[in-house]
Amino acid sequence: ETGGRVEVLESDDKNAAYTGPLTILVDRFSASASEIFAAAMQDYGRGLVIGQQTYGKGSVQNLYPLDRYALGQDPGYGQLTVTIGMYYRVTGDSTQNRGVMPDLTLPSAISTDEVGESSRDGSLPWNRIRSSDFRREGAFTPLLPELQQEHDARIAGDPDFQFAVSEISALEKMRTEKSVSLNLAKRKAEREARAQEQLARENARRQTLGEPVLKAATEIKDPPDAILGEAAEITADLSQLEPKFLARASGTDKGT
């Protein structure tokens, strides 16, 4: 807090609500409370964080109505937002500015250069304090190479996922454009060219799936959420690998 006091937040309930395989899907818009949860699951080895680097909102604010201190019936001065504290992980690291880094990375259309605390001028820097005394419930590090291998093999043959990647690449290309033509005919031609490129990507996806191709870009509908689908596949992989790893670690694996 602002006075330098460290308050450790604890739970009186020592029982686990769920003990099965757990993944936490995050992206650059995951901020504040969702970052605290993801970081806690990661630090305790309780859950696998997948997706994109999170927002990096690790500060605590309070609102102070300025009208309370003003004279007059209806001054209308608004309110002041004051930072009064910071959140820290049990490791002592802050989530401020850096956010939470995923254990397995998935592509995202959200630019980390444009969204997040680190992209804002004057944002509070990352820092750390002394670690808390805590006990890890598990460790996913030994499973990551096999999970990554399964993920890479699966997405290589997933038309929906590859379509999502191509859409993200097209969006990133548009972000790099530093000028816009003021000529109306040229602008329309550029827009039509992008529509045709999107139609080509969609039809490539459809052909791979054995679906009929479309004739116009206006016929394109939102495809399945490939990122969410792959997150579910990774969770399924984890549910298969985690018991085997625990059995090997405890010496109870009989090779079956």
Regions found by a protein language model. Name each.
Residues 1-256:
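C-terminal "post-core" interaction segments
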